[in-house]
C-alpha cells in the first residue's frame, strides 16, 4: 500500500509515497504535514525489521523521520495527532490480536527525543488512541484471553490509567473511535512539484557530519563517492522465495573534499545511499528508503546528523557545479 492524494470528490488520485514495503494509515499535523508508520528499511535486512513514524508533505516532498524508533518495540502504528501537544501511537510486538500493544507518545516539540510509554498493556492490549477536545483520551482495550474483544475506554491523560468504559458490544471489536467536534483547520502548503518533470535533486552539505556511533570515521573524510541504490518493485515474474526487495545500482557520484555532493535522480523511485572509499569499498550505508518528487530539491546536513542542529552557513563545493545526473534523467535544473 502507498499514500495517495485526490480532489475532494475522489478524482485525480496522485501517489505521494514510494516505499518498497507497505505504509499504514496517516494522520495530519496542524502544519499540513502527514504522519504515518512505515518500515525503516527492508524488513528482515540491514536493521530494517521495525517501523518508524515518518513525516511528509501532502505533495510527497520532504520525507523525514518523525520518530526514528531505533530501539523501541518493532511495530508502532495507529498514529493520532493529539490536541495536547502530543502524537499518540500504539507500540506492538506482533503478538496481540489486530496489532494491539502499549500506548506511547512523542511531543510535537521534540518528537525525535521524547518517546514516552503512556499506558502499558501487560494484562491486555490497546488500539486506536484518540485525544479529545476536552483534554481527555480514549482508546480501545482488550483484556488478555482468546474469547475477549476490544472495547472503548477513557484513559487518564496524565497517568495512562484505564478509567471508565465508554462503549462495548459483545462479540465485536470497538475500534477507530472518532470525535464529532470542531477541529482546527490545518495549514495549507505551497508545492515545488512540477509533474511535467521526471527528476529531482539530492544534495548534502557534508557527509563528514554525523552523530551516529560507528560512523566517527566519516568526520575526517574517507568517503570518495556516493552510490545510489534503487529498490525494484515486485512483478508477476518475481519468485516467491526471493528477497523481499530487489535492489540495483542506479549510479555513483563524486563526493567533494568538503564532503558535499549534488545529484539529480529520477523522481518517484525508492532510493538509499551508500558512501564508498577510493577503492569502492562501502564505508557507510543508509538503511531507510527515500525519494524525490518531480522538481524537488532535497537537502541534508550530513550522514545521520543530529536532526535538531542548524544547517552550517557554508556553500558546499558540489553546489557550485551542475548536479551529477544518474539514471534516465531529463534535466530539471533551470
Task: Locate each region found by the language model.
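Sequence context surrounding c-type heme c attachment/ligation sites in exported
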Residues: 170-172, 252, 257-334
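Conserved beta-propeller blade repeats
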Residues: 20-35, 43, 71-90, 120-132, ...
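Beta-rich catalytic cores
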Residues: 22-24, 49, 73-75, 99, ...
Amino acid at each position: 500500500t502507498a499514500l495517495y492524494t485526490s480532489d475532494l470528490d475522489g478524482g485525480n488520485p496522485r501517489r505521494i509515497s514510494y516505499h518498497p514495503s507497505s505504509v499504514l494509515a496517516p494522520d495530519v499535523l496542524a502544519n499540513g504535514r502527514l504522519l504515518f508508520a512505515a518500515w525503516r528499511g527492508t524488513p528482515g535486512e540491514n536493521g530494517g525489521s521495525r517501523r518508524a513514524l515518518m513525516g511528509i508533505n501532502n505533495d510527497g516532498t520532504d520525507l523525514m523521520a518523525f520518530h526514528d524508533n531505533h530501539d523501541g518495540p518493532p511495530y508502532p502504528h495507529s498514529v493520532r495527532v493529539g490536541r495536547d501537544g502530543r502524537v499518540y501511537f500504539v507500540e506492538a510486538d506482533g503478538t496481540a490480536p489486530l496489532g494491539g500493544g502499549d500506548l506511547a507518545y512523542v511531543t510535537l516539540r521534540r518528537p525525535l527525543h521524547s518517546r514516552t510509554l503512556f499506558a502499558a498493556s501487560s494484562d491486555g492490549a490497546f488500539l486506536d488512541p484518540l485525544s479529545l477536545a476536552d483534554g481527555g483520551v480514549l482508546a480501545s482495550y482488550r483484556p488478555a484471553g482468546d474469547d475477549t474483544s476490544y472495547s472503548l475506554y477513557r484513559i487518564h491523560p496524565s497517568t495512562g490509567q484505564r478509567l471508565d468504559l465508554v462503549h462495548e458490544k459483545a462479540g465485536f471489536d470497538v475500534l477507530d473511535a472518532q470525535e464529532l467536534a470542531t477541529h482546527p483547520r490545518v495549514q495549507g502548503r505551497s508545492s515545488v512539484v512540477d509533474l511535467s518533470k521526471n527528476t529531482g535533486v539530492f544534495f548534502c552539505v557534508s557527509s563528514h557530519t554525523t552523530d551516529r556511533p560507528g560512523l566517527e570515521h566519516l568526520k575526517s573524510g574517507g568517503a570518495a563517492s556516493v552510490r545510489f541504490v534503487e529498490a525494484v518493485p515486485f512483478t508477476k515474474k518475481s519468485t516467491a522465495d526471493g528477497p523481499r526487495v530487489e535492489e540495483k545500482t542506479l549510479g555513483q557520484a563524486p563526493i567533494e573534499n568538503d564532503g558535499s555532493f549534488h545529484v539529480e535522480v529520477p523522481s518517484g523511485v525508492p532510493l538509499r545511499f551508500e558512501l564508498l572509499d577510493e577503492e569502492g569499498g562501502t564505508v557507510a550505508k543508509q538503511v531507510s528508503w527515500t525519494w524525490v518528487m518531480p522538481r524537488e530539491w532535497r537537502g541534508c546536513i550530513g550522514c545521520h546528523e543530529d536532526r535538531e542542529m542548524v544547517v552550517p552557513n557554508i556553500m558546499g563545493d558540489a553546489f557550485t557545479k551542475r548536479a551529477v545526473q544518474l539514471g534516465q534523467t531529463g534535466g530539471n535544473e533551470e
